[in-house]
């Protein structure tokens, strides 16, 4: 490949959801992007099925939220962990109405359709070139200023970096069965409309209400493999139907796919080496018990995109990219460690230990929410939360969502007198976010392009200091 053909600002290896989103975000910023994928076609069967309200907000930043919302199913329901007798042990709360990010808090979707929307979004940008059916043999082939590996758990780019894996302790094979169900069948109608984690020591399972599908409704069963199960044969209908016949049978649904996956919990140390960077499964993997695997990769893309744009455009030093791993690794590790703890509750197969587990919840179900961790140290003021957490997205007086008024820029929100006459190229939004600021005992906040809080201020002097401390020249 000649440099005249492929010289670009950023080359992305992998055109799955993470790579395609990153290419959309960089394309918006006018960067020259080449994105590669070894497969010519989108994988036609479902894999990830859930994302949260923060991720929908990221899709909004990419200008694709309305199309993705039309293709997905918003849900106000949570996730229930129940024991073998059906008693609820734990509940991840749902969110009624709009969540703090201006969208429903949970969404279910069909991954091939999501990928089609993301790839179609790339056609908006003449500065983004897509190379499908193109297998990269070495990163040395890529004549680009930066290379981002969004190429999954067997990442070529990660091997070139030499990242070090950190094992977080969970590795377990599960069977994943997607069914297209008759929406009028009585047994289908009787299924819960929320996700269920069945903590049955005889056979732990997960049941997910995904949404509508051609010819019916899609439901997913994830079934833990037990000693004696043959992974090569358990995918056969004759073997998996008996596992789920207490809910459905062949007369109620047809299998769309059955496959065995080993769920892993691992993070990599070393997300960057020179021009090489990682995002998504190439630098972390989580079991699906919190529904946050794809979400984590898309957060990577949102964090990395504005930093790459700032560096390439010359408004920030290259060292800004070092903050990517330092911020994201502890953040994603919080989610993975919670998923591992939930997996310990779900995957208990010793009957006496399961009875002891159930007794811990005799006083009532434990309620929990998604964590809201602080970013690690990096492009933010060194201060406790709410610095380093994501700012909510209110609707403005003119009807727009806040992010629509900001674009991919820094912003300052808060009390009007503090913002009046402030010398900065950041977007000023006086009177916005006052309830949030009052909750935290502050009067103003400086927001990054990914809407994480760079700094908060109690007075004008603190606000001026925060704006002066920005390592990126806003604009």
Predicted regions and their residues:
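Conserved FAD-binding catalytic core of PHBH/FMO-like flavoproteins
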Residues: 80, 120, 146, 150-263
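Glycine-rich FAD pyrophosphate-binding loop
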Residues: 27-47
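N-terminal Rossmann-fold NAD(P) dinucleotide-binding loop
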Residues: 19-20
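An active-site-proximal "capping" alpha-helix that borders the catalytic cofactor pocket
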Residues: 298-312
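A conserved short coil-to-beta-strand element within the FAD-binding core of flavoproteins
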Residues: 132-141
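FAD/FMN-dependent oxidoreductases across multiple families
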Residues: 71, 231-296, 335-338
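Active-site-adjacent segment of FAD-dependent monooxygenases/related oxidoreductases
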Residues: 47, 52-121
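Helical substrate-recognition/capping region of FAD-dependent monooxygenase/halogenase enzymes
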Residues: 1-9, 13, 28-29, 38, ...
């Amino acid at each position: 490949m000649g440099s005249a053909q492929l010289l670009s600002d950023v080359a992305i290896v992998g055109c799955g959801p993470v790579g395609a989103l990153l290419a959309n975000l960089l394309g918006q910023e006018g960067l020259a992007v080449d994105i590669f994928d070894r497969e010519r076609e989108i994988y036609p069967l479902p894999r990830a099925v859930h994302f949260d309200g923060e991720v929908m907000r990221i899709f909004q930043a990419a200008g694709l939220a309305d199309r993705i919302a039309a293709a997905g199913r918003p849900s106000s329901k949570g996730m229930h962990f129940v024991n073998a007798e059906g008693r609820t042990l734990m509940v991840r709360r749902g969110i009624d109405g709009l969540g703090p990010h201006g969208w429903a808090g949970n969404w279910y979707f069909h991954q091939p359709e999501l990928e089609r929307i993301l790839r179609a979004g790339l056609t908006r940008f003449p500065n983004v070139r897509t190379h499908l059916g193109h297998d990269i043999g070495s990163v040395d082939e890529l004549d680009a200023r930066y290379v981002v590996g969004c190429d999954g758990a067997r990442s070529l780019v990660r091997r070139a970096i030499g990242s070090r894996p950190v094992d977080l302790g969970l590795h377990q094979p599960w069977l994943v069965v997607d069914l297209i169900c008759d929406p009028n069948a009585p047994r289908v109608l009787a299924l819960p409309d929320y996700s269920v984690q069945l903590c049955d020591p005889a056979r732990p399972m997960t049941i997910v209400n995904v949404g509508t599908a051609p010819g019916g409704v899609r439901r997913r069963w994830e079934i833990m493999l037990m000693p004696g199960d043959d992974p090569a044969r358990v995918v056969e209908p004759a073997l998996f139907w008996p596992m789920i016949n207490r809910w459905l049978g062949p007369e109620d649904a047809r299998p769309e796919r059955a496959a065995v996956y080993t769920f892993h919990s691992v993070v990599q140390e070393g997300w960057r080496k020179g021009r090489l960077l990682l995002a998504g499964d190439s630098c972390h993997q989580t079991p699906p018990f919190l529904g946050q695997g794809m979400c984590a990769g898309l957060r990577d893309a949102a964090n990395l995109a504005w930093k790459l744009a700032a560096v390439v455009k010359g408004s920030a030093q290259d060292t800004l990219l070092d903050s990517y791993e330092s911020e994201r690794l502890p953040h994603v590790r919080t989610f993975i460690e919670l998923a591992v703890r939930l997996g310990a509750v779900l995957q208990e197969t010793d009957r006496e230990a399961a009875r002891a587990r159930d007794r811990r919840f005799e006083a009532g179900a434990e309620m929990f929410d998604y964590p809201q961790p602080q970013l690690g140290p990096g492009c933010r003021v060194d201060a406790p939360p709410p610095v380093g957490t994501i700012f909510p997205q209110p609707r403005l007086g003119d009807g727009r969502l806040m992010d629509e008024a900001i674009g991919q820029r820094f912003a300052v929100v808060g009390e009007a007198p503090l913002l009046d006459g402030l010398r900065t190229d950041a977007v000023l939004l006086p009177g916005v976010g006052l309830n949030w600021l009052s909750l935290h005992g502050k009067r103003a906040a400086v927001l990054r392009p990914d809407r994480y809080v760079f700094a908060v201020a109690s007075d004008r002097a603190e606000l001026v200091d925060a704006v002066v401390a920005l390592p990126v020249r806003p604009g």
